Design a protein with these regions (language model features):
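Conserved alpha/beta-domain cores
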Residues: 1-189, 194-196, 202-204, 219
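Short, basic/aromatic-enriched C-terminal tail that caps enzymatic domains
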Residues: 202-222
Length: 222
């Protein structure tokens, strides 16, 4: 018997504790990152009333959530992985949030399919703060122009910024930079913080925590 629900409650209690101790203004939502996990591992969370879940691959998300989501309109599904333009239509159809908007071509496709499907997606611009070649994301010095393009030319619903700090880095430093960038654009939401650094992310004002391992356990990736 897995203890995903107990783990979620434990994390929720820890989040409450941090919010109260640090007198934070923001209480972040917990996105349970379910990529690679079977639905049997997730069902107890869904039955408990948890609604925010994250996936990083379109096909897996369709197979796992397509039918379930059609029956439960409260589910809020988050695309947290790299999104290719040829998968944009499926992403717009299935997801409620996309955390990985990182180029003009993708922005155009999302705009196109929003109109076709008569649906507005909540979008985060992904930032590549450390200019890591293996990671996607807009450079910080390109952010303002890209944001204005998405807003004024495409009327996209940009709600915030997302980042993935470099492994073994001072996450707090990167989170603080993202917070300042969001403040400059008057963006309220921040998608930052995973199982290993969510406490630091909270101190910088994260509004969405992307948590997988700490709730569902280690992934079996072959």
């Amino acid at each position: 018997m897995h203890n995903s629900l107990d783990n979620l409650k434990r994390v929720q209690n820890k989040v409450n504790e941090i919010v109260n101790e640090k007198q934070l203004k923001t209480y972040p939502k917990i996105i349970v990152v379910t990529k690679t996990f079977p639905f049997s591992k997730i069902s107890s969370l869904l039955n408990s009333g948890h609604t925010h879940f994250g996936e990083n691959k379109i096909q897996e998300a369709e197979d796992k959530w397509g039918e379930v989501k059609s029956k439960n309109k409260n589910i809020q599904l988050h695309m947290i992985g790299k999104l290719q333009t040829n998968k944009a239509k499926k992403a717009v159809a299935l997801f409620d949030f996309i955390h990985s908007l990182d180029n003009q071509k993708l922005a155009l496709k999302i705009c196109q399919y929003e109109k076709e499907l008569n649906k507005k997606i909540k979008l985060f611009i992904q930032i590549n703060l450390a200019d890591e070649s293996q990671k996607s994301g807009i450079k910080l010095n390109e952010l303002n122009d890209f944001y204005q393009y998405c807003l004024k030319e495409l009327s996209l619903n940009i709600i915030g910024l997302m980042c993935l700090p470099p492994i073994n880095s001072n996450s707090q430093e990167y989170f603080s930079k993202i917070k300042k960038a969001a403040d400059r654009l008057n963006l309220r939401d921040l998608s930052m913080g995973m199982s290993s650094d969510y406490e630091a992310a909270m101190l910088s004002g994260s509004t969405y925590l992307r948590l997988g391992t700490i709730i569902l356990g280690e992934r079996n990736i072959t």
